[in-house]
């Protein structure tokens, strides 16, 4: 298969990209040495390898702009704001993937499993890179990024009970997947660290060192505990009562002596939003014209980012809060683990952030009943959900 697009550069070699795959299977149970294994229903080894392309429709080889207006001499004039410079060298993103699997079934398909190994590597991913400002732009898109992933998955299916009127089936699935950003560029003015060498779901956070005697956060820097204001190295502004150093609150000018590079160095790897292990199991019961399904899903080794349950600079006595507010530091609760309150009015400013934590396995239970007899007219299917985190 040979696909082409006019969304890339003018050079014909960038317009087309071959898509191909090759696969094969070996039905081992049909071999002569297993001919007498009557109990074996299926034993098959599968392998595949191939390449496929992807088009990033957010980019273009042509100059892009948005229609706008401006004031010139007191009169409104139309203008075009250039949002993307022309780039004639963009090409397809390409992904190479391989897969190996073993299928097994026995005892009239009452017991079966699939064991699978897979890997993927995507190249020429379109990323943003910094270019000299003399060009009139500060960044452009280029085929530079690269990411890889690999994993293992196991699925077990059983028929536990099978009679004339009743059948009980179980399916269990568990998978482990890892991914890694092999190549990526970041702008010099980026506040976030590079993902290169980390998972695509990597989370970076500032490592805290508890609270001081006034309930204000402290941080680690170069192995030492330092105050929040000293940590970011500039004066506390009214719009940033703790001196948190949140980028949008930075006071540009002589008061600021912290750079984007400094901020990136403060951030440490906290974990990944991509779970290490996922899985679940499903039980399905059939009795005459009724069937009932009970399922559970889980994830392990995942970091979650959640918004704080309160804003220390914007609290309201008339607002409902969770019981976690009892853990907020105050002069009467010096054992509190959450930062103290610094304001109670909207005008006091804002000091929001994200909290990173390792959650309990996420479980979703649900029951499904359907295939009711035709003389039951109330409903044809009943779904009952119970979700717990």
State the predicted function of each range.
Residues 3, 101, 263-266, 278-281, ...:
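Short, hydrophobic/aromatic alpha-helical segments in well-folded domains
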């Amino acid at each position: 298969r040979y696909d082409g697009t006019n969304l890339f550069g003018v050079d014909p070699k960038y317009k087309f990209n071959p898509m191909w795959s090759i696969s094969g299977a070996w039905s081992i149970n049909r071999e002569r040495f297993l001919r007498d294994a009557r109990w074996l229903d299926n034993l098959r080894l599968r392998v595949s390898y191939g390449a496929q392309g992807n088009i990033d429709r957010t980019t273009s080889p042509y100059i892009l702009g948005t229609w706008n207006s401006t004031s010139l001499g007191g009169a409104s004039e139309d203008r075009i704001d250039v949002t993307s410079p022309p780039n004639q060298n963009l090409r397809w993103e390409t992904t190479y993937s391989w897969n190996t699997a073993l299928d097994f079934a026995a005892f009239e398909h009452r017991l079966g499993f699939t064991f699978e190994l897979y890997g993927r590597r995507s190249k020429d991913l379109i990323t943003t890179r910094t270019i000299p400002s003399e060009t009139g732009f500060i960044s452009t898109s280029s085929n530079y990024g690269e990411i890889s992933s690999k994993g293992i998955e196991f699925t077990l299916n059983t028929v536990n009970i099978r009679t004339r009127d009743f059948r009980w089936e179980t399916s269990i699935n568990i998978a482990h997947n890892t991914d890694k950003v092999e190549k990526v560029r970041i702008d010099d003015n980026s506040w976030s660290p590079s993902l290169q060498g980390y998972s695509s779901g990597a989370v970076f956070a500032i490592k805290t060192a508890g609270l001081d005697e006034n309930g204000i956060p402290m941080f680690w820097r170069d192995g030492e505990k330092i105050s929040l204001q000293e940590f970011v190295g500039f004066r506390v502004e009214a719009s940033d009562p703790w001196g948190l150093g949140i980028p949008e609150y930075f006071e540009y000018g002589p008061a600021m002596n912290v750079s984007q590079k400094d901020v990136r160095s403060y951030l440490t790897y906290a974990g990944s939003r991509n779970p290490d292990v996922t899985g679940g199991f499903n039980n399905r019961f059939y009795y005459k014209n009724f069937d009932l399904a009970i399922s559970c899903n889980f994830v392990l080794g995942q970091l979650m980012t959640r918004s704080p349950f309160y804003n220390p600079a914007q609290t309201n006595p008339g607002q409902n809060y969770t019981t976690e507010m009892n853990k907020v530091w105050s002069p009467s609760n010096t054992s509190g683990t959450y930062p103290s309150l610094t304001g109670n009015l909207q005008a006091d400013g804002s000091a929001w952030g994200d909290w990173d934590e390792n959650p309990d396995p996420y479980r979703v239970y649900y029951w499904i009943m359907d295939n009711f007899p035709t003389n039951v007219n109330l409903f044809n299917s009943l779904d009952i959900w119970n979700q717990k985190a």
